[in-house]
Amino acid sequence: MLRYSLKRLLSLAISLIIASLVIFLVIEVAPGDPASFMLGINAQEDTLNALREELGLNQSKLERYLSWTFGMLQGDFGTSYTYRTPVADMVQDRLWVSLPLAIYALALSTLIAFPAGIYAASRRGGLGDVSIMGATQLGVAIPNFWFAMMLVLVFAINLRWFSAGGFPGWDNGLFTGLKALTLPAIALALPQAAILARVMRSSLLDILNEDFIRTARAKGLTPRQALWRHALRN
């Protein structure tokens, strides 16, 4: 077990190093000079050189990569070229909205997917199964941004049940904050719910074909009883 864990950790470390190299190289080959972008095209050359020195852009690529990597390990993600503020501070500020949104979307997708997958598996080949599988196929095929636009159009612009944009902040109350996150959470949850529902249905159908389910049915259990008492536990 220890050997397996060490191999997995080594594999993870190698993957992270490769990913960091790819990200760094993509940024390096991108056109443009960060100093010129931050100061504008009319900036004086001595001002540009001073900013390049401050940002470490005059260092070699290897030095910049090592500085960037060790900085990330210490929680220093550098300075945003656009906002000229520490990236860690920007991430922290937005995390108070992004993390609850992700949890909200995960909860919604689970609440939608599990009942849909269970119902589809219990009605295999029936109208309910076909309808749910058709809906999940649409959910997988249609991108999130289209769902988001339709939700805003219907529920924010036409019905005016929700705000069309912006986040009021948690200072205005938990209900107000969650209400503002509802439409984005639904837009994120629907495609994930479609995938989870299909996985749930497929897993249940595999279990329903197992020998212990046949044994339970032979003992007199109805298909629904076998599903709820045995299949869902596994």
Q: Can you say where each PLM-predicted feature lies in the sequence?
A:
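Membrane-water interface at transmembrane helix exits
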Residues: 23, 27, 31, 35, ...
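Membrane-water interface segments at the C-terminal ends of transmembrane alpha-helices
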Residues: 22-29, 59, 70, 134-165, ...
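Hydrophobic alpha-helical transmembrane segments of membrane transport/permease proteins
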Residues: 16-66, 159-180
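Alpha-helical transmembrane segments of integral membrane proteins
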Residues: 2-4, 13-16, 93-130, 144, ...
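An internal, D/E-rich "acidic patch" concept
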Residues: 58-114
